[in-house]
């Protein structure tokens, strides 16, 4: 096991682009002993180990089997909501097993200590596992064709060259359908360059069966001179021109955040639970707001359910790069440790998260989750009275729950932000490094510049960053005062009038969605708001409590629907989808997006068009944005934030933030 952990750490550090802090912060100690406190708690290290042992002592797995997943099989939602402290906690694990080229699923009853179900899944591929990743890389770098390709470019195989297996995507012309393949580009890492992607070896790519280690093909195409080593990629990455005086967040005493049990979080009127998940990263559950002593439901569960990052370069060594990172690698599996004072305030609460590995054990990522409160520097509300020459107001404070997966060259800061006003923000900050390719063009006056930049931008001399998209799909099981909810659309319509001297104004038309499906854009109105509403309860004014879904980043995929990458990622074609709650519909692109040839996710979930009015429904939100690359992304991408807001409407009787005292002394007027 110790040897495996060392191998895992080496894999993680390499995939995270040689970030030494990742290695240093990876726990090598025995997994923590954790007691289960709630039915939605993540599997403990002991439970993961027990599940693997039960599978291996049954016919479901053997000593050679690898596990693409060993995760909590959640109880039915109705059972979770009916559970009370002190009641028994049923525990089941769901496992994905890979052995001798075959995939199967299993359900393990941990309470009864037995395997209760095994299902073969022919043609399906689990996410890329580290043992396969390492086998593929080593096989390619030992291949004579690889060595010869380097020599053609004046390079020698050795420690200054490294290669990183990527998920292969799906292109029909690939002759390796059914095999567990990865595609492998290579880079140079001499002169202690930081992530080394600054010097890609263009035209060289391996295709390897990661399961068998067979090198199926070596693409040795065009030869492009390596770009010069750019400044700013070394360990001395930042050299400020002038020192910046420290700006810090201070918290009186122990602050207002309370964390208990297994990541139960309480802050002001908010309560929720968080759990680690190898695929989703972090899942937020049982979100409630205490309204004058009454805990009210807002969300049963929220998490990232898939990503889609297609690059816009037709070159064969780039066209396959249409990554679906959650299902192909796992946001939790590649979560990075957080640094106090950089990733989170020094006053934050830092927590370690434990994940299952591929052989039935666990590893712990230290400081993988942080929870903190912060002043925004903005007023929560204010008003200036001209007659009294007096300002009244309160400063705004918010709670942030944060984790940061590092997916190859990109780091994604994923936040769930809660305010005293009852709003929830979903925020993602993209940073890290643009993926780049070498080019002969030094600047835009170079003879080849126009042709070379047809699918990207020159961001430094001899370096192009291809254009690409980012799509994050959130699964939002929102509960507005319970589970019987309806999705509404409030459209703003211009309305002519004939009195009062005006010609027109706008009015609101409300539409009910009656069936599952994508929520298409309404081009006839002056805008719209989606609203999840409970038609069976009312506020003091007899209005039905609702949650508005305010989307701010709404790019949708414009790829051809018959384009093979798009065929696997149908969720990206619409900003919102709505489906009836089903316990097995958890992932936007289906359970097995790795090497998939069709979409088994949202389009399939809603194909039967079930009725959704006054039902327990799930809203799926696609946070999409196009990345037109630019020199300002270089040498490192400044964090680019994207967000959507879940805002209460007709939910409270008044502004709920009026009841909280921020505890800040304001100067006398």
What do the predicted segments below correspond to?
Residues 61-111, 157-209, 268, 401:
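Exposed beta-strand-loop-beta-strand "reactive/processing" segments of non-cytosolic proteins
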Residues 39-81, 129-171:
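Short, non-transmembrane alpha-helical segments in secretory-pathway proteins
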Residues 22-26:
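Boundary at the C-terminal end of the N-terminal hydrophobic targeting segment
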